[in-house]
A protein has these predicted regions:
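Short, conserved secondary-structure transition motifs
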Residues: 130-142
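Acidic carboxylate-rich catalytic motifs and surrounding loops in phosphoryl-/glycosyl-chemistry enzymes
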Residues: 33-36, 129-132, 295
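Positively charged, Gly/Ser-enriched RNA/tRNA-binding surfaces
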Residues: 8-29, 37-38, 61-72, 77-124, ...
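Auxiliary tRNA-acceptor-end handling modules of aminoacyl-tRNA synthetases
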Residues: 1-9
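Polyanion/phosphate-binding surface patch
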Residues: 31-57, 78-80
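Acidic, His- and aromatic-enriched active-site or binding-groove loops in soluble protein domains
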Residues: 48-55, 143-165, 225
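A conserved hydrophobic position in a structured secondary element of the catalytic/binding core
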Residues: 58, 131, 250
């Protein structure tokens, strides 16, 4: 079914305005990344095209695009709002990235900002599952040849794929136990400490949570609402030339499906003849008022 672009844009405009205001309050600056860039093996997603025998990527994953353009000068606090392409499929996202020398602080800050955004949008029934790639890598160290099969099983949460592997029953049981480990605590210090520092009962340890993007280093997380059939966002930590980074992206179209728009009634309605009414409206705007011109 063809989307009503104008109606959906009105909803996204309201959502994005709220998100921008929160991120500005947290001291983040918006980054404007070029839509078309020379193809680079480090870029993820995007639409790959050729032009005059040169290869380009259109709207690639912003985290990988920032990594390609990384320069010194910490801390770096940036956010972006744009459509991300994966082939010809596109999704509108709002994302943030925080790079600094403190690998604990950046995760705690990022997750607190996530809370601020979702509460501002009155999406208070969210929950966040936090997992660890490093735990899985250590667990499968002695069966590396099945790494791709195991991570496919994790992404699909399909135990039968693990069941079919020619590995010992003890190892299968260890993998199943990790895959099903979910709760307020998990017994792994890095995750338990992070949940304690964020101090919000909507955050859970979930070792079955994995993210396919290759730049994630260890901690990853997914954001859910019971009103949405898919995650409304996701993120994780990574390293960039020795610097610790953490960020997340929100799926604006998924959020639009569950966001309840409240009618704005704080506009000053201005009418009258064109010359006088628009002069008055301009003065009101300069004084910080919001105006709506009567037609």
């Amino acid at each position: 079914m063809k989307k009503d672009v104008f109606s959906e844009s009105e909803r996204l405009d309201i959502i994005v305005s709220e998100i921008r205001e929160i991120l500005k309050r947290w001291g983040y600056q918006e980054i404007f990344l070029p839509s078309v860039v020379e193809h680079d093996g480090k870029l993820r997603k995007g639409l790959n095209i050729t032009c005059q025998n040169e290869f380009y990527s259109v709207n690639p994953d912003p985290t990988s695009q920032m990594a390609v353009n990384f320069r010194d000068g910490l801390p770096i606090r940036k956010f972006y709002i744009r459509e991300i392409l994966d082939g010809i499929e596109g999704k509108f996202q709002a994302g943030i990235e925080f790079l600094c020398d403190d690998p604990v602080r950046n995760k705690v800050e990022i997750l607190n900002i996530l809370i601020s955004i979702l509460e501002r949008l009155k999406i208070e029934d969210f929950y966040v599952d936090i997992g660890s790639l490093k735990i899985w890598k250590e667990t499968i160290e002695n069966i590396k040849e099945y790494r791709d099969d195991i991570f496919t099983a994790l992404r699909r949460r399909n135990l039968s794929l693990i069941d079919d592997l020619p590995i010992s029953s003890e190892k299968k049981e260890e993998l199943w136990d990790l895959l099903n480990l979910r709760g307020e605590k998990c017994g792994f210090d890095k995750i338990d400490r992070l949940i304690d520092l964020v101090d919000d009962d909507r955050f859970y340890a979930d070792l079955g949570t994995v993210r396919p993007l290759p730049y994630y280093d260890d901690i990853i997380f997914e954001i859910y609402s019971p009103r949405a059939g898919f995650p409304i966002g996701a993120g994780g930590e990574y390293k960039l030339e020795g610097t610790h980074g953490c960020g997340f992206a929100l799926d604006l179209e998924m959020i639009s499906e569950i966001y309840n728009i409240e009618e704005e009634n704080d506009f000053v309605v201005v009418d009258g003849d064109l010359k006088t009414s628009y002069r008055r409206a301009r003065g009101l705007v300069e004084d910080g008022e919001k105006v709506r011109m009567e037609i």
